[in-house]
A protein has these predicted regions:
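ABC family nucleotide-binding domain
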Residues: 1-256
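C-terminal boundary and immediately downstream tail of ABC-type ATPase nucleotide-binding domains
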Residues: 253, 257-276
Length: 276
């Protein structure tokens, strides 16, 4: 699904990522761990080009999305992102937060189709009868887009037990509730992969479990996930690959049993001795 080849990222001459190579297959649950400042979050943000890579390739479905000539927004539709601090819009209700991206993007596509049809209609005036172009088929309206997005958002909120919070603002929610809303907001776009940047680190300990339970459910459904986290128990239980990054390099990548039970790299052994 995703091939990362010799990925590099520099900030003001400082090399934060140094030749990252890794493959993420469909259905992988890959947990990324490492000390603070090691490049974990930068790696994640480079995967959907929230940070432009300095060098290397990120091949997603055969397309190098690190190439500046590629329309990254087309590919971001298939790659959800969940942030450490939720990043909900405080001036919009919970359900509006979930509906925002699907409605915006589908309405944008609708406007493009209508504009194309106007151009086709105009240019057809100057074409011969046998050379006229057929208009783009339009099968929806803005009202239908909004209606369907609302239905989907309500289904997602019901799934996480927060349907009664649909019309409240994020400021009234607990941290755990905000993060669950952020996760289903990502699901509203029907992504093929979701990137999680330390999704529990800003939560009170009592609220961590409800977020991890939702992530476990997604894993059981086959969602491809790449997760930067300090939750070692979650990594042991749910991941099929665990990646250790230090000083901008991958020092070890292995299944959880091998990664935690028989680490090869001395730096990883040292790190695990301090966190387990």
């Amino acid at each position: 699904m995703i091939d990362v080849i010799n990925l590099e990222k520099h900030f003001d001459g400082n090399r934060v990522l140094n030749g990252i190579n890794v493959t993420i297959e469909k259905g992988d649950i890959m947990v990324v761990i490492g000390p603070s400042g090691s490049g974990k979050s930068t790696f994640l943000r480079c995967l959907n080009c929230m940070e432009d890579p300095t060098g290397g390739q990120i091949i997603f479905h055969g397309v190098d999305i690190a190439d500046m000539k590629v329309d990254i927004n087309v590919h971001r539709r298939n790659m959800g992102m969940v942030f450490q601090h939720f990043n909900l819009f405080n001036n919009k209700t919970v359900i509006e937060n979930i509906m925002l991206a699907p409605v915006h993007l589908q309405c944008k596509d609708l406007k493009k189709a209508k504009r194309r049809n106007r151009i086709i209609k105009l240019t057809n005036l100057f074409r011969g009868k046998d050379k006229k172009k057929a208009p783009v088929e339009i099968t929806t309206t803005k009202a239908e887009i909004v209606k369907n997005a609302k239905i989907k958002a309500e289904e997602l909120l019901e799934r996480i037990g927060l349907l009664d919070k649909a019309n409240v603002y994020p400021s009234t929610l607990s941290g755990g509730q905000k993060q669950r809303v952020a996760i289903v907001r990502s699901l509203a776009m029907n992504p093929e992969v979701i990137l999680f940047d330390e999704p529990t680190s800003a939560l009170d300990p009592e609220m961590v479990g409800e977020v991890l339970d939702l992530m476990k459910a997604l894993a059981n459904e086959g969602m491809t996930m790449i997760i930067v986290t300090h939750e070692m128990g979650f990594a042991r239980e749910v991941a099929n690959k665990v990646l250790f990054i230090d000083d901008g390099q991958i020092l070890e990548c292995a299944p959880p049993a091998e990664f935690f039970g028989n680490p090869k790299n001395p730096r990883l052994k040292e790190f695990l001795s301090k966190v387990l």
